């Protein structure tokens, strides 16, 4: 890590939608884009743009499974230099009313794409 990548990391945190996405990803090992969209009640284009920015800043990683794109926080390994920063950020999120609302909504909307598309359950079961 150098100062340029560190600056990009902190710049990635300077937007409320990106902070809300990070808060959700701190709650789950990984999330499908459709779960993030449904939880935050934002358009797909907005969420995708912010996820792309977080990916550029090396804050999130993604993987494709069938038609779905999943995102995760790779920084949650103790060996990563910013691991403890994210732990501190999680504690800060616990004191944020908007963040608590998002977490509560996530528990209600989790796996939205699977629930709204019965064929997805068959695809996921095959893997």
Segments (PLM) and residue ranges:
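Amphipathic alpha-helical dimerization/coiled-coil segments
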Residues: 78-127
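Beta-hairpin "wing" of winged helix-turn-helix
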Residues: 56-65, 72-74
